[in-house]
Regions:
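Bacterial N-terminal signal peptides
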Residues: 2-10
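Sequence context surrounding c-type heme c attachment/ligation sites in exported
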Residues: 9-154
Length: 154
C-alpha cells in the first residue's frame, strides 16, 4: 500500500503565454521560464482541492481529481493546471517521483493541461489516472496558471 499526503497548493504563478501553450509534461517553474517573465508572477485567488482514494496499491491505477474554484481569467478564458509532486519548481512531475500518468482529462498523459472556460464559468474539475511504480509515501500538489483583469493575459 502507498500512503498519500494530498496537500493544497493555492498560491501559484499567474502569468503565461497568451492563448496558452498546450498540454505537456512540465515542471512548475515553467510558469516563469517558458510562459513569460518570472517578475510578472503573482498570487492566485483560485482555490484548488486535490483528492484521491485513501488507500492506493502499488501497480494499480488510481484517479486523482482536482477541483479549481474562484477562477479569474483573462479575455481568452484559458487556464493551465498542474499535477506536481514537489514545490521546488524543477524535477516535480509525478514521473520524477516514480508515478506513471496513464491518462489526463484532455485525453493525453501529461501533468499540465489547459482548459478554456465558458463565459461566466469560474470553476472546473479535472482528473488524472496514475500508477505508482515504487512503494512509499508521495505528496501531491496542484498549481494553476491564469490571467485576470489586472494581470498578464493567458
Amino acid at each position: 500500500m502507498i500512503l498519500l499526503t494530498l496537500l493544497l497548493f493555492c498560491s501559484a504563478f499567474g502569468a503565461a503565454e497568451p492563448g496558452g501553450n498546450g498540454d505537456s509534461m512540465r515542471d512548475m517553474q515553467c510558469g516563469g521560464a517558458c510562459h513569460g517573465d518570472a517578475s510578472i508572477n503573482e498570487t492566485s485567488q483560485a482555490l484548488l482541492s486535490l483528492s484521491a482514494d485513501d488507500t492506493i496499491y502499488l501497480g494499480i491505477p488510481t484517479t486523482m481529481t482536482l477541483t479549481a474554484t474562484n477562477l479569474e481569467t483573462s479575455s481568452t478564458r484559458v487556464i493551465g493546471l498542474f499535477l506536481l509532486t514537489d514545490m521546488t519548481g524543477h524535477s516535480d512531475t509525478p514521473q520524477d517521483a516514480g508515478w506513471d500518468i496513464l491518462s489526463d482529462a484532455n485525453g493525453g498523459s501529461v501533468n499540465y493541461i489547459e482548459r478554456t472556460l465558458t463565459s461566466g464559468q469560474n470553476e472546473t474539475t479535472i482528473s488524472w489516472v496514475l500508477r505508482a511504480s515504487s512503494l512509499g509515501p508521495t505528496s501531491f500538489y496542484a498549481a494553476i496558471h491564469h490571467g485576470g483583469a489586472s494581470s498578464s493575459p493567458f
